[in-house]
Amino acid sequence: ILDVEAIAKRTGAKVISNYEIVGYFEKLGIEGHPMNHGGKWTFDFGTVHYTNAIHSSSFPDGTYGGQPGGFVIETSHHRLYIAGDTALTYDMKLIPDVIGELDLAILPVGDNFTMGIDEAIKASTFVGCNKVLGVHFDTFGYIKIDHNEAITKFAKAKKELYLLPIGDNLKL
């Protein structure tokens, strides 16, 4: 959330999030589109579904950030799930049933503040996706992970885990 303002102002990107977060950034002059749990909206790039997530939600100044959420983004070629910095939740099981098969699941793996490696493996099973891009890890001590151990655990579960350095990309 700390980079949203700078990125949106630099790129002109629209902020898509819950009502409270969009309202916060609109006060800073940034265009947004508010959503809420269970909602979907079709944009020029594809359809966005707002999904459940479980974690705290506040801004650095203490402003309440509303109920947390994740997203499923559908384009003409791909469908991906962005869990956000959530815990494992049983609601994830609904995603493939309600929205459809995923090409990639972007899941937190750092533990302590989010789910860890073992829970991310379970989450990838819940959402029915064997390709996972790990996020929310290694930025500070509490969420450091052993990359080799994480990749090995995913491989033993017959899943692929991608742990990209900052600035890298992944082609679907």
Residue map of PLM features:
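Short glycine-/acidic-enriched loop or helix-start segments at secondary-structure transitions
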Residues: 1-4, 25-27, 60, 91-93, ...
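Binuclear metal-ion centers of metallo-dependent hydrolases, dominated by the metallo-beta-lactamase
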Residues: 14, 22, 26-40, 121, ...
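Metallo-beta-lactamase
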Residues: 9, 13-16, 49, 73-130, 135-144, ...
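Core dinuclear metal-dependent hydrolase active-site scaffold
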Residues: 34-100, 166-172
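Active-site metal-binding motif and surrounding structural segment of the metallo-beta-lactamase
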Residues: 1-26, 31-33, 97-106
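Short, glycine/charged-enriched secondary-structure capping and boundary segments
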Residues: 5-7, 30-31, 63-64, 95-98, ...
